Amino acid sequence: MEQLDQQQAETLSAIAQAATPEAVEAIRVSALGKQGWVSALLKSLGGMTPEQRQSEGPKIHAAREAVTTALAERKSALEGAALEARLAAETVDLSLPAPDLAKGSVHPVSQVMDELAEIFADMGFAVASGPEIEDDWHNFTALNMPETHPARAMHDTFYFPDKDAEGRSMLLRTHTSPVQIRSMLKAGAPLRIIAPGRVYRSDSDATHTPMFHQIEGLVIDKGIHLGHLKWTLETFLKAFFERDDIVLRLRPSYFPFTEPSVEVDVGYTLVNGKRVVGGSGDADNGGWMEVLGSGMVNRKVIEFGGLDPDEWQGFAFGTGVDRLAMLKYGMDDLRAFFDGDARWLGHYGFGALDVPTLSGGVGVRS
């Protein structure tokens, strides 16, 4: 078996010197292929006597194992070296500045909607929604606005030529108050909801658009009075503007769906010529501005909601989401909200991770 030892030594030497995977494969074929010398020796075992097989068999199998192992190790080494060379040639310079990628932003109105929902959820309010195409009963009649009420005029309301199955006129809702009626009819009392959403009125200037966003709140329970309303609004505005020095002023007003009705002013301070919400409006450098309409729910509205006004009382409030966004984040023209200007959105928009939380701050930016 001197020839076996010599062939094995020559093969192992050739494997060690192989410089390419192709050379390794050629050696494998010459040794382990069908016509290879190792294969020939394995075939010769069949013609040997039992004593010869017992003597030579282990040597032949050992040679095959040695060659197989050497081939695998050399192939792996060559592949590793090739990979390292390729990686070295493709090295990325991480110090180079990355190109700016276009990214979207959360619209201020959407962000403020989330802020309001977070605040009122902490106060026990549920979010309710309703159709934007309403009938005049839910939009006007059930809210104590009869057919002769001026709010029904064509110049204030977008009407459709269609009527519903009951012959009621269809329109784009002028406020989210119909959601209050639908919620009372569906859920009954006690009730504590906010109703954010889009509303429509025929008006357009720097502070008004034909479509805008509104949020209204409704609380129905036993023993509700105006003090509950004031506490709710103070708590809400302090959380929203993230200031403890919020001062409210309630002025008598008129809304057909509340009695008594009050308009809510918030005190502000002039800082570098700009209004900053907070502090008393009676201060030398301060003033008052209206932010909310509210009042105790009219008895007729409670009746239209299917409840007994002698048993249940409530308060309601409403404000423009767009106006709140303008006050909090310093935007001047409401029409810019809907222009789709990417530069404006890039400046005033919020990141996807700017999720409002009471613990982290409802107006936080990442």
Curated annotation (Swiss-Prot):
Disulfide bonds: none annotated. PROSITE patterns: AA_TRNA_LIGASE_II. Mg(2+) binds at E259. CDD domains: PheRS_alpha_core. Its EC number is 6.1.1.20. Its cofactor is Mg(2+). Binds 2 magnesium ions per tetramer. The keyword Repressor does not apply. InterPro entries: aa-tRNA-synth_II, aa-tRNA-synth_II/BPL/LPL, Phe-tRNA-synth_IIc_asu, Phe-tRNA_ligase_II_N, Phe_tRNA_ligase_alpha1_bac, Phenylalanyl-tRNA_Synthase, tRNA-bd_arm. It catalyses: tRNA(Phe) + L-phenylalanine + ATP = L-phenylalanyl-tRNA(Phe) + AMP + diphosphate + H(+). GO terms for molecular function: ATP binding; magnesium ion binding; phenylalanine-tRNA ligase activity; tRNA binding. It is an enzyme of class 6 (ligase). It comes from the Bacteria. GO terms for cellular component: cytoplasm. Keywords: Aminoacyl-tRNA synthetase, ATP-binding, Cytoplasm, Ligase, Magnesium, Metal-binding, Nucleotide-binding, Protein biosynthesis. The keyword Transferase does not apply. It is found in: Cytoplasm. GO terms for biological process: phenylalanyl-tRNA aminoacylation. Tetramer of two alpha and two beta subunits. Belongs to the class-II aminoacyl-tRNA synthetase family. Phe-tRNA synthetase alpha subunit type 1 subfamily. This is Phenylalanine--tRNA ligase alpha subunit. It comes from Novosphingobium aromaticivorans (strain ATCC 700278 / DSM 12444 / CCUG 56034 / CIP 105152 / NBRC 16084 / F199).
